[in-house]
C-alpha cells in the first residue's frame, strides 16, 4: 500500500504493471516453456543500470544502503553481497490458482540457461509485461492511497525533481502468500 503524504509538482507518478494479466495474455505454447523455470534475483542486478560491472566498493555501498533503509541496522562485518541473492519461480501460482510472472529489476538470470539467453528472456518478458495493455499510471494527489497485490504487480516511480516535496509512505502487509 502506498500513501501520498506530499506530491511533486511535476512527475513522480507511479506506474503499475499487472503481472497476472501479462501471464494470462501469453500464448499457451510460451506458457508451457516458461512453467518450471527459476530466476535468480539480486541487489547487484537491480543496480546494473548504474554500473554494469560493479566494483566491490559499489557492491558494499549498495548492501549498506539496504541494511540502513530496510533493516535499520548496521551491516554485519561478515556480510557477503551474494547473500542477498534469492531464487524464485518465474511463474508463481496464487492460492486462488491464478498465475503471474515474477519479474523486476532484481531478476538477474534464469537458472540452467546460458547467461545471455536467460537475460534476453527476462528482458523480453519485462517488455511484454509493461506494455500499455497491462499497466496503470497513478497521478498522485496528497492523501491518495493505492493498494496493490505485490506478487501480481510491478511498480515504478516516474522521474521527478529532487526536493520537490514528494513523500510516500509504504505499508507492507505480510501473510502466507510467499513466493518461494
Region roles according to the model:
Residues 1-145, 151-180:
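Non-heme Fe(II) oxygenase catalytic core, chiefly the N-lobe of the double-stranded beta-helix
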Amino acid at each position: 500500500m502506498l500513501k501520498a503524504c506530499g506530491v511533486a509538482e511535476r512527475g513522480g507518478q507511479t506506474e503499475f504493471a499487472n503481472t497476472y494479466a501479462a501471464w494470462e495474455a501469453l500464448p499457451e505454447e510460451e506458457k508451457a516453456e516458461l512453467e518450471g523455470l527459476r530466476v535468480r534475483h539480486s541487489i547487484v542486478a537491480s543496480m546494473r543500470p548504474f554500473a554494469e560491472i560493479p566494483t566491490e566498493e559499489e557492491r558494499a555501498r549498495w548492501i549498506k544502503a539496504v541494511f540502513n533503509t530496510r533493516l535499520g541496522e548496521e551491516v554485519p562485518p561478515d556480510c557477503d553481497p551474494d547473500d542477498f541473492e534469492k531464487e524464485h519461480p518465474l511463474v508463481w501460482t496464487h492460492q486462488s490458482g491464478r498465475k503471474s510472472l515474477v519479474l523486476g529489476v532484481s531478476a538477474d538470470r534464469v537458472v540452467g540457461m546460458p547467461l545471455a539467453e536467460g537475460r534476453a528472456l527476462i528482458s523480453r518478458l519485462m517488455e511484454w509485461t509493461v506494455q500499455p495493455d497491462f499497466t496503470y499510471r497513478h497521478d498522485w494527489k496528497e492523501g491518495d492511497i493505492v493498494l496493490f497485490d505485490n506478487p501480481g504487480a510491478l511498480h515504478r516511480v516516474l522521474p521527478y525533481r529532487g526536493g520537490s516535496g514528494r513523500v510516500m509512505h509504504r505499508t507492507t502487509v505480510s501473510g502466507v502468500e510467499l513466493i518461494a
